[in-house]
């Protein structure tokens, strides 16, 4: 789904506006192996404070689900960089799983991650995603047992996304040892590519994780902080940061 050594930026759709999100995506796409696009939700419990605030800004600005699909549709006119929708189950449930995935596919989405859908309850999601040709991505955390990691790998058709513990996402000064321990286990167990998202904020972090075996590195909070500070005018700062993190 992405080439080895990729940077995978995360942005929240609609923060601070749908038009701005499209501009931001186009500003960073040339340095991105894939892009995660978050669907705002009113109770984003699995995210840290930075990304939670991003969800709230988007919702306060009038975000509607259709805006996300329109953003991807417009993005597809200019770029073929893979887009992975990152969402909670509630927005999917409100629309209906089949309709949500169908709309995602029609707009040009490549993959989908439902943050709070455990792999053991994902059979319908897997079936519909397979029918629609949408890649599936599942999360694994440091406390995920090996047997569960095998199940996650088997269910994932895009990549396995290794994260810090729920609610602790955020830019850090150093990558915690738990990241490297989980990555080591995942490389032993998983047949899929693995992407790691552990508070990456510097190129040094990206290099450390890639050298430790990650196929891709996700960066979210460091970019969302830029949007929080610069709002509609974050485009150039985002481009510079993503280029720096990608080592280009």
Curated annotation (Swiss-Prot):
PANTHER family tied to this protein: TRYPTOPHAN SYNTHASE ALPHA CHAIN, CHLOROPLASTIC (PTHR43406:SF1), TRYPTOPHAN SYNTHASE, ALPHA CHAIN (PTHR43406)
Q: Which reaction does it catalyse?
A: (1S,2R)-1-C-(indol-3-yl)glycerol 3-phosphate + L-serine = D-glyceraldehyde 3-phosphate + L-tryptophan + H2O
Q: Which family does it belong to?
A: Belongs to the TrpA family.
Q: Which residues form a coiled coil?
A: none
Q: What is this protein called?
A: Tryptophan synthase alpha chain
Record pathway: Amino-acid biosynthesis; L-tryptophan biosynthesis; L-tryptophan from chorismate: step 5/5
HAMAP family xrefs: Trp_synth_alpha
The active-site annotation reads: 36, 47
The organism encoding this protein is Pyrococcus abyssi (strain GE5 / Orsay)
Q: Which domain of life is it from?
A: Archaea
What quaternary arrangement does the UniProt entry report?
Tetramer of two alpha and two beta chains.
Gene it is expressed from:
trpA
Q: Which NCBIfam families match?
A: trpA (TIGR00262)
